[in-house]
UniProtKB/Swiss-Prot annotation:
Pfam family, one: Ig_mannosidase
Signal peptide (from-to): 1-17
Keyword vocabulary terms for this entry: Disulfide bond, Glycoprotein, Glycosidase, Hydrolase, Lysosome, Signal
Gene Ontology terms for molecular function: beta-mannosidase activity
Protein name in UniProt: Beta-mannosidase
Disease linkage: Defects in MANBA cause beta-mannosidosis, a severe disorder that affects peripheral and central nervous system myelin resulting in tremor, nystagmus, ataxia and early death. The primary storage products associated with the enzyme deficiency are the trisaccharide Man-beta-1-4-GlcNAc-beta-1-4-GlcNAc and the disaccharide Man-beta-1-4-GlcNAc.
Length: 879
């Protein structure tokens, strides 16, 4: 194969010796198994599993029990090979590098049968000097070692003491010792995902040749001068200089929209050199800042930086630069022990509302630009402003962060360490240091990233005794923890990026953890930092179940995906809640029973004699249960923003677990694999609305709060309505006098004893009626219509099966569903099967005879296709 040379950034007339070339090695490769019995083509970027699937040697890895049947793939040692010709004499170049942006994971790299380097970290860039090895005709081999075997070998060599955990719980069908390999930790199995320890070249690979120097990293960070009230821009460019002579030239920075044109003289000496440029923006120039979604615009400015160096060598970089500040505020709170824990963006306190992001697929080459756009657009469509990139996955691809910049999604960025203790031997630490240095350089220019976090739950795992470690080794583990996350990761982060905070773990007690030597005896202290909270036994409709914490960065409940999603990876014999498939797909111990337990607290379990009908009804009820549970919990956190009760409160963040799915299985997600919205995601669109009325009971008293995430005070009125389950006619209604909710506050709007409320509504009891309420001004709805159940729905009286029909019409690219119902219907679920798209609302309480809902397709469809696929379910249909 003849590869063309891409001449980079060289002006016309420049001598060939000054040019830089980049030769892409993406595309067609060959792979073979350890014994050579399997030989096949493969695509780079990619992995072995994808290559086998594309050649139909294996079926869909997600189908039924294939995660077990295909375990042999990860246990084998695979080799990638590429033969290519170069039409240029590489000997004319001073330096030639073979660069891998990502290798998964443990491999020996050979060029023309000469070993040129080893890899052991999925998360770092590798650059190998091949100046004296490259020829006109070349063969690259990447000989991978099984990650499963490697992890076991590294664990066996660590004989001084145990580094737990050894293996995941048996229910996860996973592999052991993932903490000994710098690889996507969930690829060895997790409680929501399969074990697929991949091998492959998962990112870009190329050859770079140059004579003078090469630009390796280009970074920039806006800095606000509080004293001068001006913006500055720091631009850092990392060069590899191979010339023995001093290289001189100019760096020209241009930001036309800010009237910036600045020229700097620069000099580069031999070796790894970083050029720092400082751009001071005139105080008279108005700079529009970047704001999170819902709080303002995501204004960015086009910037170009041109390096014109000796001999006509020219490098040009273009980027969008955003201006914003971020501050993590930990300060005393009146009438409360402890400290606050919240983020200020551009000086404004922001309540983080969102979810947690996990890898969108076990096979990263299947995560397309379209899929990222769909998932992240669904984030802002649900009124979220933040995601936590969880530490057991991957540092996401560049496009992920670019989309978050564009959409205004704040990112809490974990480093990739999760639910484990880790070794601190020299080889491991050397690899981690390279990883962290690379990722900070790669990511720090993104305004969307507002904080770094050292790990997921590892402080809690150590200090709360998750792994039954021997007491005599506690100090050893503490020393290792501080060595890894504080002395190394934290040090590297703070040296490379002074523009955003770093916390050592999540959950953590923040400043208190630091004061206690980086590990707190109780990392879940509600008076400090962030917490993670899960409780599948207590009644999730009871708000007293939940912690009145400063910031809740994980919480949630499981549900099953829709039947249309499961159908693609299952067969008819699997369509039962007690089937082998249903048990196999559930990776949380007792998870399926815990869902039934929560359902039984407030709903009737399906009892149809038709097995498929009962299965579908159960799937539906798990989504109803999950949505209602997370709604109750999130609303509790939102109304806790402005209050302190018994020293607890001032909650400033709610990130539920989890946003997306890695495969088709029961999980905590609100988006199914492929992006279909669960009922929870529709609920999130309401409970994360900028203005929300929240209702709850305490000692027979109904309270309604108003929670505002607006930037300005708002005058409005509250309307409270009562319906019976047996009639579509409104029983009674009352409205308050106009009042003002202050910007960014949560305040009590309404209190009334429930017996008094019902007394004024003829024929109403707790079991026969339901309360709804909303905020409005001058007849205009300002909030979602919220509701409060006065009893468990399994005890509801007068609830009938509703005959709900839909008339579908098309308006441009949108479809209109005009609904009619014969009865009050809770949890009305509209479904169009596998047709990709989302509704404007779903899972709603229908108390009116008619309602109009819109469907936004993600791919072209038709009215007839929607009519054929349409199905509607409400709660009474499951009885």
């Amino acid at each position: 194969m003849l590869l063309r040379l891409l001449l980079l950034l060289a002006p016309c007339g420049a001598g060939f010796a000054t040019k830089v070339v980049s030769i892409s090695l993406r595309g067609n490769w060959k792979i073979h198994s350890g014994n050579g019995s399997l030989q096949l083509p493969a695509t780079v970027p990619g992995c072995v599993h994808s290559a086998l699937f594309n050649k139909r040697i294996i079926k869909d890895p997600y189908y039924r029990f294939n995660n077990l049947d295909y375990r042999w793939i990860a246990l084998d040692n695979w080799t990638y090979i590429k033969k290519f010709k170069l039409h240029s004499d590489m000997s004319t170049w001073s330096k030639v590098n073979l660069v891998f942006e990502g290798i998964d994971t443990v491999a020996v790299v050979l060029l023309n049968s000469v070993p040129i380097g080893k890899t052991d970290n999925m998360f770092r860039r590798y650059s190998f000097d091949i100046t004296h090895t490259v020829k006109a005709v070349n063969i690259i081999e990447v000989r991978f070692q099984s990650p499963v075997v490697y992890a076991n070998q590294r664990s066996e060599r660590h004989t001084a003491y145990w580094v737990p955990p050894n293996c995941p719980p048996p229910v996860q069908d996973g592999e052991c010792h993932v903490n000994f390999i710098r690889k996507m930790q969930c690829s060895f199995g997790w409680d929501w995902g399969p074990s697929f320890p991949t091998q492959g070249i998962w990112k870009d690979v190329r050859i770079e040749a140059y004579n003078v120097c090469h630009l390796n990293y280009f970074m920039f960070t806006p800095i606000y001068d509080n004293y001068m009230k001006t913006w500055n821009l720091k631009i850092e460019s990392s060069f590899d200089v191979v010339s023995s002579k001093l290289v001189s030239g100019e760096a020209i920075v241009a930001i036309p929209e800010l009237n910036i044109q600045q020229t700097n003289n620069i000099e580069l000496q031999h070796g790894e050199r970083t050029v720092e440029l400082f751009v001071k923006i005139d105080k008279a120039i108005i700079v529009e800042t970047w704001w999170p979604h819902g709080h303002g615009n995501q204004t960015g400015y086009n910037m170009s930086v041109i390096f014109e160096l000796d001999g006509g060598l020219r490098f040009e970089k273009s980027a969008k630069v955003y201006f914003r500040t971020v501050e993590l505020v930990e300060e005393p709170i009146q009438n409360s022990p402890g400290l606050s824990f919240y983020f200020k963006i551009n000086g404004l306190p922001i309540f983080l509302k969102g979810s947690n992001w996990i890898p969108a697929d076990s096979f990263q080459d299947r995560v397309t630009s379209a899929m990222l756009r769909l998932l992240l657009q669904s984030v802002v469509d649900a009124n979220m402003n933040a995601l936590r990139v969880w530490g057991g996955g991957v540092y996401e691809q560049d496009e992920f962060y670019e989309l978050c910049d564009e959409l205004g999604i704040m990112i809490w960025q974990d480093f990739m360490f999760a639910c484990a203790l880790y070794p601190t031997d020299k080889d491991f630490m050397d690899s981690v240091r390279e990883e962290v240095t690379h990722q900070v350089r790669r990511l720090k220019s993104h305004p969307s990233i507002i904080t770094w976090s050292g790990n997921n739950e590892n402080e809690a795992a150590l200090m709360m005794g998750w792994y039954d470690t021997k007491p005599g080794y506690l100090q050893t583990y503490i020393k290792d923890y501080v060595t890894l996350y504080v002395k190394n990761i934290r040090t590297i982060v703070l040296e490379g990026d002074q523009t955003r905070p770093f916390i050592t773990s999540s959950p953590t007690n923040g400043a208190k953890t630091i004061a206690e030597g980086w590990l707190s005896p109780n990392p879940y202290d509600l008076n400090y930092g962030d917490v993670h909270f899960y409780d599948y036994v207590s009644d999730c409709w009871n708000w007293r179940t939940f912690p009145k914490a400063r910031f809740v960065s994980e919480y949630g409940y499981q549900s099953w995906p829709s039947f249309s999603t499961l159908e693609k990876v299952s067969s008819e014999e699997d369509w039962s809640y007690r089937s082998s498939f249903a048990l196999h797909r559930q990776h949380l111990i007792n998870g399926n029973n815990e869902m039934l337990h929560q359902i039984e607290l407030h709903f009737k379990l399906p009892n149809s004699t038709d097995q498929l009908r009962r299965f579908k009804d159960t799937l539906y009820l798990t989504q109803v249960m999950q949505a209602q549970c997370v709604k109750t919990e999130t609303e509790f956190y939102r109304r806790s923003r402005s209050e302190i009760v018994n020293g607890k409160g001032h909650t400033m963040g709610a990130l539920y677990w989890q946003l997306n799915d890695i495969w088709q299985a029961p999980s905590w997600s609100s988006l199914e694999y492929g992006g279909k919205w669960k009922m929870l995601h529709y609920f999130a669109r309401h409970f994360f609305a900028p203005l929300l009325p929240v209702g709850f009971e305490d000692k027979d008293m109904l309270f309604i709060y108003g929670a505002s995430h607006l930037h300005s005070d708002q005058q409005m009125m509250l309307t409270v309505r009562v319906h019976t389950w047996s009639s579509l006619e409104l029983v009674c209604s009352e409205s308050t006098n106009p009042f003002v909710i202050k910007a960014g506050e949560s305040v009590l709007l309404y209190t009334k004893p429930v017996p008094e409320l019902l007394k004024g509504c003829p024929g109403c009891t707790r079991q026969s009626c339901v309360v709804s309420f909303y905020l409005s001004t001058d007849g205009e709805l300002l909030s979602p219509i919220n509701y409060h159940f006065l009893s468990s729905l399994k005890n509801a009286k007068g609830l009938h099966k509703a005959n709900i029909t839909a008339t579908i019409s098309q308006q441009g690219d949108t479809f209109v569903f005009d609904l009619k119902t014969s009865a009050v219907a809770p949890f009305v679920w509209l479904d169009v099967g596998s047709i990709p798209g989302r509704f404007s609302d779903n899972g709603f309480l229908m108390t009116e005879k008619t309602r109009t809902v819109f469907f936004y397709p993600w791919k072209p469809t038709s009215k007839s296709e929607l009519e054929q696929s349409f199905h509607v379910t409400s709660l009474a249909d499951t009885y």
